[in-house]
Amino acid sequence: KDLSYVELQGRTRVGYETEALISYLEEFLGFTQRHHAFLIGVGSLGSGLLADKGLRQFGLEITAGFDVAEEIVGTEVAGVPVYHINELATRIEAEGVQIAILTVPILQAQHMTDRLVRAGIRALWNFTPVRIQTPEPVVVQNTSMYAHLALMFTRLKSALQGDREA
């Protein structure tokens, strides 16, 4: 029933052809298109994301990193060039990038968000624990490792209690 909204025709009591369904879902989810993104904050987490080639399988290609640390600006991390944050607006305009990945320190999160929105970014993948504020048309996807860590601890506690009760 959940798949009744797709434009594919399934067969009664048989379902959908697997290959066609996978192709349709990949297209629908945007995995078949190439979405270029800039990464802001090339620290430990940012560097890890730059090195993650698996993101390309899902249509995301990080084409540049931005930071303020002089020791990293002008270098490449996993083949991705790192620029000074002062070049951000110019490069967003020149390259037409609409997606930014935010991995900056907590105290910089909202300021950097405001700067990205002013420069034309339309979607933010936010890895900071800060719930950033943006104007309505800007898409924000919050990914909090801390929230997921708390969830894991809660699930572990529940599982361990279940073991004791069994």
Tell where the protein language model's regions lie, with residue ranges.
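Glycine-rich Rossmann-fold phosphate-binding loop(s) that bind the pyrophosphate
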Residues: 42
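Phosphate-bearing ligand-interacting subdomains
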Residues: 76-165
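Short, solvent-exposed amphipathic alpha-helical segments in soluble enzyme
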Residues: 53-57, 116-119
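Hydrophobic/small residue at the entry helix of a nucleotide-binding pocket
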Residues: 45
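Short active-site oxyanion
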Residues: 36, 62, 98-100
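HTH-adjacent hinge/linker in prokaryotic transcriptional regulators
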Residues: 1-37
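NAD(P)-binding Rossmann-fold cofactor-contacting core
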Residues: 56-78
